[in-house]
């Protein structure tokens, strides 16, 4: 049955209901008179390359925030590597839990190890957890589950669209970040010497996640092959010398295909057991937490199926897939053979049980006018039999969408992209900076959306072993959080929804750890976690599992969302998590004889490990800064909500009296250290010594400026190995007003891949790395989605508001002329301003919640404030170089020279 455009749009819109409910206050605002067209500017920054580009890391990245596609071009084919945010091998071997010591028992073990080191006359020994035999034995025991190859993101397979390279040559490929459309131009020169061009178009539909591939004229494609990923893992994740587990493979995927009148269809079903094998239980039974995914592809035209039964039989075999001559045998899959040139259309749909459940919940939400909290799906949810019927659902969706004109689908998707780009826009005279901002906003939109699973280290792009290092998991010591650093200032609050759901899913585990292991109230957040049903702490491993900073860091952006939106109803949902973190920290700190609160013992991220008698495990600067951040946030949150008055007083007392930041007189003057008694001039992996600036947000321009000198000196002289700081370090410099944008561009360029993404690349030996280190070893692990936060660095150069004072263009060294529209400021203000390279030339702001505004004076001369609506004057006061005035909700204000 032909589906009308209206019916299609109505059906597609259901997928966006929860997001709109979550962010009703963040809809695009009416443009100002000098409005920037973000969609048009994004279109100027297309990615263009000359194929072939067969390598994954040359491939063009597409996505809709859930489904991800990496498009690669060989001389003989276009390949689409398909991934999805919630497609994971979810197995966890839970046998380690019985070995995990309580915190008191761990401290006793640490004390014994310290005595052993001193007995050996090695009082300066580092990493006791791996250097002392009995401590190493414990460490290896509790790390055994993490050393297994699972869990990990599971690729959804690869589609290869083949042509005869004698007659067809790929010429040019482009990716339009404005609309997410990928285009490949082919030159056709057939045996009759007739030449023409053929254009392939591919996009991932914003609303439905449909992967669409079409041609503009009949295409001489010889075959379409689908190759599912198979579990043949034999090595452990990066970070361990070797795996101590005999590989136990996932069940093989089930494939099928059929050809009909004017179409062909192929499918893959992959079952995911939730329980991993252990020596005691090598073949775990099915459980109610098991999951799966299904992929269905539907081709228009005439196709024949080749070798299906043989390939199904091969997949039914147990053990490794037998290799042919030289190991080059075609992997088992689906092979569809084409004939004469024909109009080409391929629809691909991937479905998980989460999709089916979410669609039902969104339909129910759309059918009521009641205010409901955003939909959240717990990771240990037991899916019903209907929700597990993903194959039938995928087939139904592929068939439904195949009868809708592809132009209608693309138009609907493009409309959603236009809405995305309407939320904020920037324009730089320096087009390199502009390109960084727009391309990375595009990449963020490809891996973040309300309702999807938060991206792990490598997001929703993977194939084979790519994207599986460290299990592709959530690292809570910056990697996971960094993805979201810029979403608020960019006015994409909706993109934070997956992280909020992640924190909700970590709460039970974190509260259990605090209670059962630490014997303390509240919640202690894990170092590493997976989007899987298992509720055990997957990495209770010394030393990194004992970084106290990870608890406040895990919760930080929950407070940011309130700070930037002033949404009290949201705060009511976030507050229990914020409070739990504060309760743990308040119970963990110790008051010293100096009347200061100390954090002892703790661990500095990836530096010293456990040391003798806590020598380098005292008062980590990251712990102090983030603990202060969270306690001050919870004091304010509890005041807003009128809650926990008694605890509030203690939180404030601790926050106001934490130990001073560790420091030392180094060769360049006084600088901060990561921990008490650390040596000067250490080479760090992250700019941990700048934690009071960021992420702590305790020191900055106009904020505790008595510490600005030491902060800027530390930033200027800190030694960093690279690989983890292409966003982190310049962000801090921008906060201090010392970022040279030319230097910033050079750092991004150093980490750039051909497909426009900046990956993690080592920069310096002498610390953990040596001259024999391959400086590119992380560049080939996967798509480091953490670096998509690069636009946030530029936002910080143009607008800062975290301190309570709004500052325009606080960092302009080699910035050049710049103009931004609707960047979001703390206090729920949408700000627009322009800078001509010398001074600020225009300012306007929209007040969403009617809060008072404090703005650093943009000019030394007199100024006036007026309402945009009727040009009526607004009175203001001045204080310490700032203007202060009240605002009305929904009103736009102009600030001008008098």
Q: Which functions belong to the PLM regions below?
A:
Residues 456-474, 521-571, 586-653:
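The feature captures the catalytic groove of carbohydrate-active enzymes
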Residues 40, 456-457, 498-501, 516, ...:
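Beta-strand segments within the central parallel beta-sheet cores of soluble alpha/beta enzyme folds
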């Amino acid at each position: 049955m032909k589906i009308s455009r209206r019916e299609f749009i109505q059906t597609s819109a259901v997928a966006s209901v929860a997001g709109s409910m979550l962010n009703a206050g963040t809809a695009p605002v009416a443009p100002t008179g000098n409005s920037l067209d973000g969609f048009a500017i994004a279109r100027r920054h297309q990615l263009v390359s000359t194929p072939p580009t067969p390598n994954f890391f040359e491939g063009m990245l597409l996505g809709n925030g859930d489904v991800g596609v990496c498009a690669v071009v060989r001389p003989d084919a276009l390949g689409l590597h398909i991934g999805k945010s919630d497609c994971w091998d979810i197995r966890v071997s839970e046998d380690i839990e019985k070995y995990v010591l309580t915190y008191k028992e761990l401290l006793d073990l640490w004390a014994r190890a310290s005595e052993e080191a001193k007995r050996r006359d090695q009082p300066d020994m580092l990493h006791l957890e791996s250097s002392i035999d009995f401590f190493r034995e414990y460490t290896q025991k509790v790390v055994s589950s993490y050393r297994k190859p699972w869990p990990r993101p599971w690729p959804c397979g690869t589609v290869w669209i083949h042509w005869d390279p004698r007659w067809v040559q790929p010429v040019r490929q482009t990716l339009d970040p404005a609309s997410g459309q990928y285009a490949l131009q082919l030159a056709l020169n057939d045996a009759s010497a007739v030449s023409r061009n053929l254009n392939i178009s591919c996009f991932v539909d914003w609303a439905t996640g449909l992967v669409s591939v079409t041609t503009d004229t009949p295409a001489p494609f010889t075959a379409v092959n689908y190759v599912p990923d198979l579990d043949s893992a034999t090595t452990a994740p990066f970070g361990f010398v070797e795996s101590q587990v005999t590989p136990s493979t996932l069940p093989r995927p089930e494939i099928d295909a059929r050809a009909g009148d004017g179409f062909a269809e192929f499918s893959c079903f992959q079952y995911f057991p939730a329980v991993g094998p252990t020596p005691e239980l090598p073949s775990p039974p099915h459980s109610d937490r098991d999951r799966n995914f299904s992929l269905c592809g539907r081709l228009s035209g005439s196709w024949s199926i080749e070798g299906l039964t043989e390939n199904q039989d091969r997949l039914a075999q147990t053990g490794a897939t037998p290799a042919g001559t030289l190991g080059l045998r075609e992997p088992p899959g689906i092979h569809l053979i084409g004939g004469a040139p024909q109009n080409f259309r391929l629809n691909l749909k991937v479905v998980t049980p989460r999709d089916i459940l979410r669609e039902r919940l969104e339909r129910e939400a759309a059918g009521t006018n009641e205010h409901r909290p955003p939909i959240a799906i717990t990771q240990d949810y037991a899916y019903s039999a209907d929700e597990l019927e993903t194959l039938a659902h995928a087939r139904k969706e592929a068939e439904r969408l195949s009868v809708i004109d592809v132009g209608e689908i693309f138009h609907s998707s493009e409309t959603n992209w236009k809405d995305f780009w309407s939320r904020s826009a920037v324009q730089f005279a320096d087009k390199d900076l502009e390109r960084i901002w727009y391309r990375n906003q595009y990449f963020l939109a490809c891996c973040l959306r309300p309702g999807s699973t938060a991206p792990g280290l490598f997001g929703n792009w993977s194939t084979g072993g790519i994207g599986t290092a460290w299990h592709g998991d959530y690292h809570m010591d910056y990697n996971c959080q960094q993805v979201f650093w810029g979403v608020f200032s960019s006015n994409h609050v909706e993109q934070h929804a997956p992280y909020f759901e992640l924190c909700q899913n970590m709460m039970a585990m974190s509260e259990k750890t605090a209670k059962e292991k630490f014997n303390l109230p509240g919640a202690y957040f894990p170092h590493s976690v997976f989007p899987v049903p298992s509720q055990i702490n997957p990495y209770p491993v010394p030393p990194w599992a004992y970084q106290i900073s990870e608890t406040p860091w895990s919760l930080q952006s929950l407070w940011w969302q309130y700070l930037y939106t002033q949404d009290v109803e949201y705060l009511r949902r976030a507050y229990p998590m914020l409070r739990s973190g504060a309760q743990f920290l308040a119970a963990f700190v110790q008051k010293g004889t100096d009347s200061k609160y100390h954090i002892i013992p703790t661990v500095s991220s990836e530096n010293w490990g456990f040391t003798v008698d806590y020598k380098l495990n005292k008062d980590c600067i990251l712990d102090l800064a983030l603990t202060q951040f969270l306690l001050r946030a919870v004091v304010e949150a509890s005041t807003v909500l009128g809650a926990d008055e008694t605890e509030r007083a203690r939180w404030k007392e601790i926050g106001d009296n934490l130990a001073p930041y560790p420091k030392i007189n180094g060769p360049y003057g006084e600088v901060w250290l990561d921990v008490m008694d650390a040596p000067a001039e250490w080479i760090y992996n992250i700019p941990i010594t700048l934690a009071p600036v960021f992420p702590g947000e305790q020191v900055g321009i106009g904020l505790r400026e008595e510490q600005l000198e030491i902060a800027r000196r530390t930033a200027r002289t800190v030694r960093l190995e690279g690989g983890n700081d292409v966003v982190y370090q310049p962000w801090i410099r921008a906060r201090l007003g010392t970022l040279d944008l030319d230097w910033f561009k050079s750092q991004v360029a150093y980490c750039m891949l051909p497909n426009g993404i900046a990956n993690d690349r080592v920069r310096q030996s002498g610390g953990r790395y040596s001259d024999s280190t391959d400086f590119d070893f992380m560049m080939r692990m996967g798509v480091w989605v953490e670096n998509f936060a690069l636009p946030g660095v530029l936002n910080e150069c143009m607008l800062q508001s975290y301190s309570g004072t709004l500052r325009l263009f606080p960092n302009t060294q080699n910035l050049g002329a710049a103009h931004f529209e609707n960047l979001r400021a703390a206090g729920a203000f949408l700000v627009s301003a322009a800078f001509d390279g010398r001074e600020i030339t225009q300012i306007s702001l929209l007040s969403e919640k009617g809060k008072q505004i404090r703005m650093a004076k943009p000019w030394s001369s007199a100024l006036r404030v007026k309402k945009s609506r009727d040009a009526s004057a607004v009175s203001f006061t001045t204080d310490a170089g700032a203007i202060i005035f009240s605002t009305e909700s929904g009103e736009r204000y102009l600030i001008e020279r008098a």
